[in-house]
Amino acid sequence: MNIHEYQGKELLRTNGVPVLEGVHCKTVDEALAAYDKLNSKVVAVKSQIHAGGRGKGNLYFPESGDLVMEGGVKIAFSREEVKTYSENILGNILVTIQTGESGKLVRNLYIESGCDIAHEYYLALLVDREKKSVMIMASTEGGMDIEEVAHNTPELIHRISIDPNSGLMGFQSRDLGMALGMSGKSLKSFMKMLAKMYNMFVSNDCTMVEINPLVKTDNDDIVALDSKVSFDENAEFRHKNWDDMRDLSEEEEVEIRAKESGLSYVKLDGNIGCLVNGAGLAMATMDVIKLYGGEPANFLDVGGGANEEQVKTAFSIILEDPNVKGILVNIFGGIMRCDIIARGVIAATEALSLDVPLVVRLAGTNVDEGKAILAESTLNIHPADDLADGAQKIVALIGGGV
């Protein structure tokens, strides 16, 4: 689950991480009032969407598609500039490297006080699933695309792994700060800030907290100038306040409906729909589709206890994507029974008048019953012996990749 920058800043502030004063706004008038309230010589006018790269993005009119303004984050030195930038941002489409060509409609602004900047850093806390730890990434190259830094100058990125049993140790914070060239007051400020940021990460069940840039001021203070925060939705039951932080307008309507039906769905840019049980198997299925020249249109995990109605809903959601030219069903029955999936597939195919190629691979619990149900139907369903066979068949049936 993602939240906006202004929400992330409030979370950081609540947990003792230094941030600048700012105001969340939804209208131009609110932005002007925020400027007056902040009483700062310079302010940042920041578009708020659930995507990175806002500063380097472009804003377009929704109707005509004409360019409105370059950059979704602007520095304003006057009330008039705040008005101009706010008018150009609110209600328009922001396209960034992370939004895709369709972009996102900007409904929220964050007006933030400015500060002097002596140096910009990159800092992020992430879940490292391979090492079963929290990974801290930091670089002296803040304010830039970290992917670009990693590609061109990987030696400038510093990584440390934190054992969740012992937590962040003081020497780790010190070593990281020194690796970034900090000393004296700035090093102490960094160590204090990082300890609070780590505690926030753990206590709020975050999967990512990214600050780009983290800045050192002329007074050697350390301040979070940006924030990107994501939560682990599996921990939602522990955090009742997450409902208040969720911005449904930033989420795909079809993904919301999928969640309400007990399905995990993420739309992608390909043309082969995927219906799979289990997140790991779903990702493996997408990988194998790409291996054989296809492009997955979605990630869809029906879970371990799906019923016929959920399978039907899953098909309906997949087929809402006009780019889908074929569907691959890949089920490994453990808790899930293959006969239930087979009946759901048939019910969905009949109810939705399926007119795209369908390949079904079944394995595991009640697999023989499931295969028999599919074989006895008069529907045009292509069985597959294994995942590789299924991926090759669906790619061939749709005439190749995208």
What do the predicted segments below correspond to?
Residues 332-336:
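Glycine-rich, proline-tolerant flexible connector loops at the mouths of alpha/beta enzymes
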Residues 355-364:
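Short internal beta-strands
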Residues 346-347:
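Short amphipathic alpha-helix used as the core "switch/output" element in two-component signaling
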Residues 1-211, 215-329, 339-341, 350, ...:
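ATP-dependent carboxylate/acyl-activation modules
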